[in-house]
Swiss-Prot record:
The lineage of its organism: Eukaryota, Viridiplantae, Streptophyta, Embryophyta, Tracheophyta. The keyword Chloroplast applies. This is Small ribosomal subunit protein uS8c. Keywords: Chloroplast, Plastid, Ribonucleoprotein, Ribosomal protein, RNA-binding, rRNA-binding. It is found in: Plastid, Chloroplast. It comes from Pelargonium hortorum (Common geranium). It holds the Pfam family Ribosomal_S8. Its main location: plastid. GO terms for biological process: translation.
Length: 134
């Protein structure tokens, strides 16, 4: 059975968020870099940087937390893996779902690269739905 790097990324971010961690370290892959770029651009994470440690590269993400008197609380976003190795989910550009009426983001893998649902609708291309973020 192979590794599903995208599920590992989602699980790492979700677990760090529930544990109220400030940073999370994920392995560096091209898919991870593209998804982190989208998360950063959409404002779901605060910062991302690359860290190299003995021939291995990692992405260190700084999560965006709300502050209150008791310390950091959970962020206000959720991640859900949609298409998985056992059941791939594809959609053309007309049927790409709107997450929370446009408040959330769907991340797609298209022939033109990894992009958000809004970008895919504007470019009129469909693809595999990787994640929902709301």
């Amino acid at each position: 059975m192979g590794k599903d790097t995208l599920s590992e990324i989602v699980t790492s971010i979700r677990n760090a968020d529930m544990a109220k961690k400030e940073t999370v370290r994920i392995t560096f892959t091209n898919i991870a870099q593209n998804i982190v770029t989208i998360l950063l651009r959409e404002g779901f994470i605060k910062n991302a940087r690359e860290h190299r440690e003995s021939k291995k590269s990692f992405l260190v993400l700084t999560l965006r937390h709300r502050r209150n008197r008791k310390g950091p609380s959970r962020t206000l976003f959720n991640l859900k893996r949609v298409s998985r190795p056992g059941l791939r989910i594809y959609s053309n550009y007309q049927k790409i779902p709107r997450i929370l009426g446009g408040m959330g983001v769907a991340i797609l893998s298209t022939s033109k690269g990894i992009m958000t649902d809004r970008e895919a609708r504007l470019k009129r291309i469909g693809g595999e739905i990787l994640l929902y973020i709301w």
